Amino acid sequence: MPPIPFLTGCRRALRGLGVAALLGSAAPWALAQLHTQPLNSGWQFRLADPEAAKAHPEAADWRGATVPGTVQTDLLDARLIPDPFHGENEARLQWIGLSDWEYRLAFDVDAATLSREQVELVFDGLDTFAQVSLNGQALAATDNMFRRWRLPAKALLKPGRNTLLVRLQSPIRKMQPWLLKQPYALPGAYDSQFGDEPKGVATATYVRKAQYQYGWDWGPRFVTLGIWQPVRLESWDHLRIEDFHMRQPRVDEGVAQLAAELEVQAGRGGSARLQVEVTPPEGAPFTLTRDVVLDPGRNALSVPVRIERPRRWFPAGYGEQPMYRFRASLTQDGVELAHAERRTGLRSVELRREKDAWGRSFAFVINGIPVFAKGANMIPLDSFPNRVTRERQRALLLSARRANMNMLRLWGGGYYESDAFYEEADALGLLIWQDFMFGGAILPADTAFQENVRQEAIEQVRRLRDHPSIVLWCGGNEVQADWETWDATLAFKNKLSPDERERLWSANLKLFGEVLRGVVQREAPDVPYWATSPGVDLEGPSGQMDDGDMHFWRVWGGSAPVETFLDTTPRFMSEYGLQSYPEMRTIASFAGPQDLRLDSPVMRAHQKFGVAAGPDVGNDRLLFYIRKGYGEPKDFASFVYLSQVMQAEGIELAASHLRSRRPRSMGSLYWQLNDVWPGASWSSVDVSGRWKALQFHARRFYADTTVTALRRAGETEIAVVSDRTQPQDAELRLRVSDLDGRVLRSERATVTARPLAVTPVWHRADAELLQGADPARTVAEVELLVQGRAVARQTVYFVPARELKLADPGFQTRLERDPAGGADAWRLAIKTRSFARAVWIDFGPLEVELADNALDIRAGEEVLIPLRATASPGDLQAHLNLRSLADSTVR
């Protein structure tokens, strides 16, 4: 296949201007301080597509724009389009991504800026094919959403008013004519539902842009364009610190041996003094000084830094997250010429892969501690990245932390997150598995494409490598699995000649096995690299049970029963999941009362699974699992509730099984934590930040110390699982009772939970537990107590939920203020007459933060649930609604 056209010459103008700028006359180093002029305000945008303007003339006028931003959100702010997430608006708004757009800015430049030797226009991110001109002169053409574009601009700037124009081309319309002329099209992840691209001819694979924006099986197709990251003008005289990084070749309890590494751009040679100031989390700062000689061009500097008995950064649950601050400065004759700062935590990271009785391990070892990874996969927080605030990021990460997660996998079909995101992860002790941005498609064999990716990887690794939260760089998502197992790709491969198959796959192996690996090994050698997920680091086929990581989709994707999870024990489960709908309040944000049925056009539009095979595949799959496990939903609201119950209980089964098989299994990352829009998906937190039942379950099944009670083939294994680093004394109570609360049998045991291990306690057959009782009216409860306080509970059922003879629980409730918690603190007391399974508490339209939900309540038991709400007591009582399995199915 010939080279991709936009990669062969788009930066020629940029190169020429760069050479001219670097050959300019010298200026004193004393003027070298970097000056930054933000250029984020005052932008305007318009539709620059004559054909599209015929249908949308109002968009062809210049209007105010937001930078950073996207065309779609600018149109929304201008009230030129409706809410993209509402109803069927997705289909109505596809024209935006198929059109070209222009952004312009008038800005002033003062004489002091123009007197600087170096003046650069810096775009931190352009989405994606942009032609940039300054004062009517072409400056650059860009082709990668994930790269920073630093454009020498002095030759084109003038004193006073300047005009910057950015023309953005539709990535679909730009690439499609070229692709249609090629011998073949690489199979993409998902074909468009809207007819703008022929089936099997997806352009997304060829474009360095967030792949999810072309549509996924959990999100809409909104192909964005825009200036999606900040813009600024930078000026300096001869000297700029291009990069500053703290390497951590050795960190242990006794010493941290670090290296302050700088890359300095100098316009001419000369001497300077390099100072590195170290500010520990506690105690006095200290400074290291070294005299250096700089050559013209790029200079690599390194200063060893030794810290005795460092305060190390630990993952959540294993210790604190102290951060050190490092400041590097270059001075001459006491005058500071340039400086840079970094904050980082000191820790060691190992991806341990050792031969053992089950094959080869896959375990993250942080500061010498083997950490069982508990968490989820994370996708972008919105279809439109500029709407993602730091507050939304922090809220989502807090949701993960409050659910006892310690790791998130940042999936490769989105975009590299902002610095703020990783700062929050650092502070919360959340480990980050960071994919490079490849979402699951075979990639072009073009060498220019690979070079573009290499530059992208260098920039992103350099930007993010000082975050202690990042403990793995992974080449991408499901690329090898795609090549080996996906039906569409297998059919595509069969049409290629053997030579072309070899050429194409060899290029992909080079990208993930050499190019990206080489970038990480050079730029962040203290963090492991993993070629593709799932896989064994390209050492064999993907999807192996005894080596590497696994994506397990026989459940849901293959319609296997959820009990299949109990027979699946990979070394690390990095994807598995079940779908559900968000709660009714979230559904009301995109659907009206008339839409609340599964076959309505609106509900179909917000269910993306399996749409290529038909509009009802996803909802039919949900109904299949609900009916199999729980019965027939009695109405739409019950369907929504049961979808969450099914998801939560199914994922709990899998996660509990994986934790109970430690150290054979050392990771559980379910798919997925969050959403980009409101609709059916695998998430545990919906796009509004509301917790589904799964998130409440995760808080329990990911607890540092918990009990597992796993029943298969008529036998139940009960064990205590501990992620603590010290032994823990506990008591285990087993109680068998009928649904009316009559105790049939009880048992107790004292146990010392082994650290970082599973402690088996009981193995009981059904006959031993039931002793002749009706299995449809009997449950076994296992409770774990530490220092007399119940910290975990598991319920064992002897029949599927649909066969349980549940009665009306007879809920009794009491709402009382919690004087110790503040003005918005309450406690909700719930008591039942008979056993209540999967109790869901909601307050209708009121925003209420519940400390617990989605729980079982035994007959006669009163539970107290803390909550926070600003509503009045009357409103809370009026809107309180309790639901359970007993009243949600047709009986």
Predicted segment positions?
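Extended carbohydrate-recognition surfaces in non-catalytic/accessory domains of CAZymes
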Residues: A32-V122, P198-P230, E234-L239, E354-W358, ...
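Accessory beta-strand-rich segments of carbohydrate-active enzymes
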Residues: L39, R46-A48, A78, L98-R240, ...
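Active-site-adjacent substrate/metal-binding segments within catalytic domains
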Residues: D77-V109, L114-V122, D127-L134, A140-D143, ...
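Short glycine/proline/serine/threonine-rich loop/turn segments at secondary-structure transition edges
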Residues: L114-E117, L157-R161, R309-M323, E768-T778, ...
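Extended acidic/polar, glycine-enriched regions
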Residues: A155-R161, E261-K355
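Short acidic/polar inter-strand loop motif in beta-rich domains
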Residues: Q169-Q176, Q332-L337, L785-A792, D887-V890
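Carbohydrate-binding surfaces of carbohydrate-active enzymes
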Residues: L262-Q265, D599-D852, I857-L867, L876-H879, ...
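Substrate-binding/catalytic cleft of secreted carbohydrate-active enzymes
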Residues: M407-A427, L431-A605, M646, G650, ...
